[in-house]
Amino acid sequence: SNAYRTTGVDANIVNMTYKEVKTLDAGSWFSDEYVGENVPSLKEVLELTQGKIKLNIELKPADNGTALAKNTVRLIEKYNMVNDCVITSFSESVLKAVKTYNQEIKVGYILSAAYGDFYDMKNVDFFSVNAAFLSKRTIDAIHNSGKRVYAWTVNNKESIKNLTNKGVDGIITDNPVLARETIYSRDTSETIVNMIRYVFNQ
């Protein structure tokens, strides 16, 4: 994962030390109010959010997939957030490793495209699929396999309504305020309100 989008530094996190990462300014891109805000560690995020919100933690392994899965699971367990976190990844092997360490943690496989019989994958609780590839047929096939499906990344009102009408179980967005306003607006059906749960059942 590259740090440029949120810090302005064109460097891959995997090639940086923890100390180097902590010197990055991760707040300026968002708002002048947050200039100088450091990149938080997962430990810091869990400490801050424990008992307050639920988290979708995406793992992006380099050559350390098993260790990354183990350390992430141990931190989640330490803060008693097994039921408050899901783990997602493009790496099936990392998700399998997560399940090896704790079967109770829900894991989701991220897909850039939806082709073939991917929905029959074992050790996966749900799929996070590029919204451009989510037809009603694909959504139904995933549901028929007993799994849930979430659409990414959806940042406009019409797409949110369209996908929820097709039956997705949740929306992944960069604009949660817009998503919430769309879901609970007067012109949004009760069916959509009931279906959308931002990855977790609320």
What are these regions (language model features)?
Residues 1-106, 129, 143-145, 199-201:
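Metal-dependent phosphodiesterase/phospholipase catalytic core, i.e.
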Residues 32-36, 108-202:
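C-terminal active-site rim and adjoining tail of enzyme catalytic domains
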